[in-house]
């Protein structure tokens, strides 16, 4: 089995566990329309990558064989038991909350191959569903059974993460009306909008299980690094992957004039990025635009940045015991920049 296959298997195994926990902790109850809308995207699919990272970090910290311990009664370092699965559900429902509100702001029609929540239901219900998931996430983080001090610290991390996600989204909106965005500003936006939830997923188990500050900070840094690499790989795939694999038009970021590490680098090389493609480009036009970006070194620049971030993230895992769960966390970092979807 290749490392990619190993990662896919680890994610699939934990995805099933997390999906069952979501059904258990977020039942469709009265008012049914609200809770049906809240569950809608969670039931539509998703890799469950962030909760997988949380559960693997817990397994590595506790130095137990993967899937050998009950996630609902997980051994902490001081010797008490913590429900790390509830924390994993908390992280996943935050992810779903952000997707619902993102789709509203972008007026998108589809998400995960199904109509967006505001299309399937209505705008008011979608807003309420997102708000419900946001508040439920804090309930689930409190349900871990960790001692008060560790619970409060985990809640503080979750609250800070949610604030930063909103700040990142605000920066993204602001960038749409600016032509002078720098690469540094873009990476800050990516850190807040995308990477901080990976950082929370990696560091919260260390908080709940009673790890020292050095370990918490190292795992937080791991999450930030791989989260930024994840977004850069998404930017690369938009240009390099076929449309049928992407589930959207290849080069859509160019058509929509979105700021990415690639286009910002190209702009700095003197390329008229906004003029690379028309509003309804042909495949040949997209291919020519990608070649222009290749020739400018912009695609290689982004690839190298993503790989450097992954290397940095993996080095931060030195705080963990050498075990299979840690190796899987390293393999996930590689997977994020090697994936083709």
From Swiss-Prot:
GO terms for biological process: isoprenoid biosynthetic process. Its cofactor is Mg(2+). Its EC number is 2.5.1.81. It is an enzyme of class 2 (transferase). Its main location: cytoplasm. An all-trans-polyprenyl diphosphate binds at residues 111, 193-194, 231. Mg(2+) 2 binds at residues 102, 106. InterPro entries: Isoprenoid_synthase_dom_sf, Polyprenyl_synt, Polyprenyl_synt_CS. SUPFAM superfamilies: Terpenoid synthases. Pfam families: polyprenyl_synt (PF00348). Binds 2 Mg(2+) ions per subunit. It is found in: Cytoplasm. One of its GO terms (cellular component) is cytoplasm. Mg(2+) 1 binds at residues 102, 106. Keywords: Cytoplasm, Lipid biosynthesis, Lipid metabolism, Magnesium, Metal-binding, Transferase. It catalyses: isopentenyl diphosphate + (2E,6E,10E)-geranylgeranyl diphosphate = (2E,6E,10E,14E)-geranylfarnesyl diphosphate + diphosphate. Isopentenyl diphosphate binds at residues 47, 50, 95, 112. CDD domains: Trans_IPPS_HT (cd00685). It comes from the Archaea. The keyword Metal-binding applies. Probably involved in biosynthesis of the precursor for C25 (sesterterpanyl chain) moiety of C20-C25 diether (2-O-sesterterpanyl-3-O-phytanyl-sn-glycer) membrane lipid. Catalyzes the condensation of isopentenyl pyrophosphate with the allylic pyrophosphates to yield geranylfarnesyl diphosphate (GFPP). Geranylgeranyl diphosphate (GGPP) is the preferred substrate, but dimethylallyl diphosphate (DMAPP) and farnesyl diphosphate (FPP) can also be used as allylic substrate. Homodimer. Belongs to the FPP/GGPP synthase family. NCBIfam families: gerfarn_diphsyn. PANTHER family: GERANYLGERANYL PYROPHOSPHATE SYNTHASE, SHORT CHAIN ISOPRENYL DIPHOSPHATE SYNTHASE. This is Geranylfarnesyl diphosphate synthase. The gene is idsA3.
């Amino acid at each position: 089995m290749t490392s990619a296959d190993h990662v896919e298997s680890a994610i699939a195994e934990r995805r099933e566990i997390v999906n069952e926990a979501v059904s258990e902790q977020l039942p469709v109850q009265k008012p049914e329309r609200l809770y049906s809308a809240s569950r809608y995207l969670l039931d539509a699919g998703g890799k469950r990558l962030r909760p997988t990272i949380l559960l693997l970090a817990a397994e590595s910290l506790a130095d137990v064989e993967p899937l050998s311990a009950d996630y609902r009664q997980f051994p902490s370092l001081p010797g008490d038991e913590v429900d790390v699965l509830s924390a994993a559900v908390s992280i996943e429902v935050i992810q779903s909350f952000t997707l619902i509100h993102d789709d509203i702001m972008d007026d998108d029609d589809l998400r995960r191959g199904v109509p967006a929540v505001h299309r399937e239901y209505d705008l008011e219900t979608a807003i309420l569903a997102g708000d419900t998931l946001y508040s439920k996430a804090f309930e689930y983080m409190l349900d871990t059974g960790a001692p008060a001090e560790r619970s409060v610290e985990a809640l503080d991390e979750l609250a800070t993460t949610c604030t930063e996600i909103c700040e990142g989204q605000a920066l993204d909106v602001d960038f749409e009306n600016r032509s002078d965005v720098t690469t540094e500003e873009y990476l800050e936006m990516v850190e807040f909008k995308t990477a901080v939830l990976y950082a929370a997923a990696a560091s919260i188990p260390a908080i709940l299980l009673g790890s020292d500050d050095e370990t918490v900070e190292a795992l937080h840094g791991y999450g930030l690094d791989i989260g930024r690499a994840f977004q850069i790989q998404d930017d690369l795939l938009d240009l390099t992957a076929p449309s049928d694999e992407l589930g959207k038009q290849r080069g859509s970021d160019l058509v929509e004039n979105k700021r990415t590490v690639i286009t910002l680098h190209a702009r700095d090389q003197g390329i008229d990025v906004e003029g690379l493609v028309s509003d309804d480009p042909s495949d040949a036009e997209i291919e020519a635009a990608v070649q222009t970006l290749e020739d400018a070194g912009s695609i290689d620049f982004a690839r190298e940045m993503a790989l450097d971030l992954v290397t940095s993230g993996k080095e931060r895992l030195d705080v963990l015991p050498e075990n299979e769960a840690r190796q899987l966390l390293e393999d996930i970092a590689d997977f994020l920049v090697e994936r083709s979807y």
